[in-house]
Design a protein with these regions (language model features):
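Early transmembrane hairpin of solute transport permeases
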Residues: 2-162
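Hydrophobic alpha-helical transmembrane segments
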Residues: 12, 134-141, 175, 179, ...
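Hydrophobic alpha-helical membrane-insertion segments
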Residues: 15-32, 88-102, 177-187, 221-243
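Membrane-interface interhelical connector segments
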Residues: 37-45, 238-278
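Juxtamembrane/interfacial segments around transmembrane helices
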Residues: 66, 74, 113-127, 189-198, ...
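Membrane-interface helix-loop-helix junctions at boundaries between adjacent transmembrane segments
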Residues: 114-117, 124-136, 148-149, 153-211
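Aromatic-rich transmembrane-lumenal/periplasmic boundary elements in polytopic membrane proteins
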Residues: 186, 193-252
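Conserved small/polar residues in nucleotide/adenosyl-binding loops
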Residues: 282
Length: 283
């Protein structure tokens, strides 16, 4: 059991390998487009700002598509066979799941108590994933769907079909089964996840109101889990997902830099979530 959990924690770290370079690009792009730091050269409309904005937008690729990356990357560490094909199956199944959720909400959002007309990325819990308006489940939704697909892949990938159905074997058969499974999961998610989002908002406030005590508990638990290789399970939702702040703490840092640089107010007021940042945690 412990080995399985450790493998899961290690698989979670796979997308994190991309964060170092992406973080450097975002950091430099944000720095060089902040007028209060760079001066008039970084004013809006200058060639300097336009060029660095292009680079900055490219740098956000990893952080803006985190759920998709986690959905695709998890099979690399957990699929027992043909991991590459499992990644493809997870990718398509995850998109299928989100299309199901989007279609259900388009038809029954008022009855489900969801404001599906809200802008993506707001507190209303709506997100856009690969161009699909859906519920904002962050990496939790990606891990759920990817985990289901991995289980189906390990179980059905080698299923023997009659010769005349051979075209449906392998990855095609896994996707067929996944397609069927995604629909009831989508139904359950649209019923349950809005209530989970309410609980997450309460949890965010509790952690922020706890101040140094909350930070101390977080850091203590993280350090305790490091010898077991399970610390990724604790910090990933805080740093890369919406548990504390929309988009994750690291993405929030980059977004907040221009405002922080231009303000004279204490950091504790401008970014109370910043106290949970621990750069050593990503090692």
């Amino acid at each position: 059991m412990m080995k399985a959990i450790q493998r899961f924690g290690g698989a979670l770290f796979t997308p994190a390998m991309l964060f170092a370079f992406a973080g450097v690009v975002v950091g430099l792009g944000t720095l060089f487009t902040t007028e209060s730091i760079m001066g008039p050269i970084a004013a809006a409309g200058t060639t300097w700002t336009k060029c660095w904005t292009v680079i900055l937008d490219g740098g956000w690729t990893v952080f803006n598509q985190l759920p998709l990356l986690f959905a695709v990357a998890l099979p690399i560490g957990l699929a027992k066979k043909q991991a590459g094909r499992c990644c493809l199956e997870a990718f398509v199944a995850y998109l299928t799941f989100n299309y199901f959720v989007s279609s259900i909400l388009s038809a029954w959002a008022p009855e489900l108590g969801v404001d599906f007309s809200a802008s993506a990325g707001t507190a209303e819990g709506i997100a856009t994933i690969a161009g699909i308006r859906t519920l904002d489940m962050g990496i939790a939704g990606a891990l759920l769907i990817s985990g289901v697909v991995i289980a189906l892949h390990n179980r059905f990938f080698d299923t023997r079909l009659p010769e005349w159905l051979g075209v449906f074997s392998g990855s095609t058969f896994v996707y067929m089964v996944s397609f069927i499974v995604m629909l009831p999961i989508a139904v359950v998610v649209v019923l349950v996840w809005p209530k989970v989002q309410v609980g997450m908002h309460v949890f965010q406030q509790v952690i922020l109101d706890a101040g140094t005590a909350g930070v101390g508990i977080f850091v203590f638990l993280e350090r305790v889990l490091i010898p077991f290789g399970l610390h990724h399970l604790l910090y990933a939702p805080f740093y890369y997902d919406n548990v504390i702040v929309q988009g994750g703490i690291y993405a929030a840092w980059a977004n907040a830099l221009p405002g922080l640089a231009a303000s004279t107010r204490p950091l504790a007021e401008l970014a109370p979530w910043a106290s949970l940042t621990d750069r050593k945690s990503v090692v």
